[in-house]
């Protein structure tokens, strides 16, 4: 920790700016049994959360308050308040970050590494998501209790994956707002151990609020990008996951993003942070706080040029509702801003009370023996059950994109394993990762499966050299079957780095093409979060099978070979659209519009119909027959639907109906089946009409050959409604069609009619007239 003297006009503030991680340790939990802190009401467990937090803040000097508005808060030694680092990460397992400290060996040197969210999204399994989050929070709490992490984690990333070029799409569960909304609801439920619990296990942080999905594209960078978004698109596409997270799942923290939204930097935007988030969604309970992304407060001044001075940037963010700075603008300049009268002490106190209320709820100031989570420790990290769950999650997410009955592989024999992922380890984790105890490589898994393996890398992810081709082709000629493992990795897509193309990088397709001409069965295993154009592989009859595996993490190799060998049948579905390569020439990444226009083709499966592979696509090793029950659907009346909604439930979350379909396994292989229910209309509400909209889904487990399974899909009123130009959520009368997309060209439909008058389910707050 460096001690820095900073003079701001009349006030001299001693800033404690941390230059390295500040981690908790068991002996630096606050001592409420003796010492100066014990004399404050913050240690009185009989009092309410806000009163306890306010007593601590009131005991601080102005200087101490300002010092503790940064992510690596130095605490207040005078009061016995220890340092605390608010920045811990756990996107798909406890991850390396300033607040997390892994040991070099032994206890706390690793944690369970689950698949990246993009692959978790492909499972379409809400129960699984909650189970994964429960394990992650348990392990995160263990690290926190041991002084190796904070008790809050800056996860999940719930910006819908709008454009395949975005470098951080791998961190999200996909492109569909309903899907992402359900994902985050169950994830937060698992992380915090309940919906709005009084005593959360850990605090989750939904990010990045809002309309953030650009890193560095053709010279446009996230630190200065102004996302121009219509009110309709904002309400319909960009905000629903955050509404689910804040209003419905009652997350304890939200992160505002780097970008500006319609001219106002997100962390300086009271319309976003106050009007929509805290007021309209009623996200205003004790312990609910907002952090800026790391450097986002500085961007208000340096990137967006929104204010003339950094002091103005600090005050503007604080006044807008940002409580914590992941940076140093708050601690360096709030003193100057106070001198200039740019904010009130009441506003500063409010931010700090929010932050410390969160720690009070976490039991940070309570006796260890009174806290249910303080006993969690190393014994609870990477348990056999956690490892099994990591394996299950990877298997469930894998998507079969092509198969001419080559899969499952029928014999052991000799297997040529070729490609840059053939023996990959850390590559399979994606980003925001932590060290796992082990990583099962494809090479390891192939050997364990009993194959005589001939392993040759052949090429690298983005290589142009063909020096390794001959060895790869030689190995393939000696094998009974060839498995090529490639795609993209974090050298191609990453935070701070968007793609400019969506083709296979380097010379990988050239090598695959040459392998396909040898005459041996060829299976391609495609890694990566963002999709690449697979047209040439799908059309090549000598590429016999194609799998997409995302970033499967520590169990990647074994999970993939479970699918390849038929130990488990594939049932994952693409959580995004796979666009043709030329799509990037039709619309810039900076264009935030979803609907097609005179110069744009439209985005996502709802508005674009020329996909190489559509959202929700996924093949199986068996066949399924889908049928609707023998009953009429509807008609429904808008007034009746609205009037029967429970008073204590937001009307858009109220039930519309539960639809029953019958799924019959007509093949010979036991398999899961993901039922995706889409809605279409051609006359309900104003044009243009989306091609279709996902309104519900469920994953039916282990349907045996010949078995008929009744599957229920619940649909909410909000899913039936459409978003008007002003952002209102409106239930329109008209004719509707339900479509079950089974991914294999079977689209059973059912129709119904909604009668009555238009009904507004949610009146969206209108932006200020100046925007």
Curated annotation (Swiss-Prot):
Xref: Gene3D superfamilies: Glycoside hydrolase family 3 C-terminal domain, Glycoside hydrolase, family 3, N-terminal domain, Immunoglobulins
Signal peptide: 1-25
Any one GO molecular-function label of the UniProt entry: xylan 1,4-beta-xylosidase activity
Biological classification of the source: Eukaryota, Fungi, Dikarya, Ascomycota, Pezizomycotina
Protein name from the UniProt record: Probable exo-1,4-beta-xylosidase xlnD
EC code(s) of this entry: 3.2.1.37
Keywords for the protein's UniProt record, in alphabetical order: Carbohydrate metabolism, Glycoprotein, Glycosidase, Hydrolase, Polysaccharide degradation, Secreted, Signal, Xylan degradation
Classification via InterPro entries: BXL (IPR044993), Fn3-like (IPR026891), Glyco_hydro_3_C (IPR002772), Glyco_hydro_3_C_sf (IPR036881), Glyco_hydro_3_N (IPR001764), Glyco_hydro_3_N_sf (IPR036962), Glycoside_hydrolase_SF (IPR017853), Ig-like_fold (IPR013783)
One Gene Ontology biological process: xylan catabolic process
Glycan-modified residues: 67, 305, 345, 423, 464
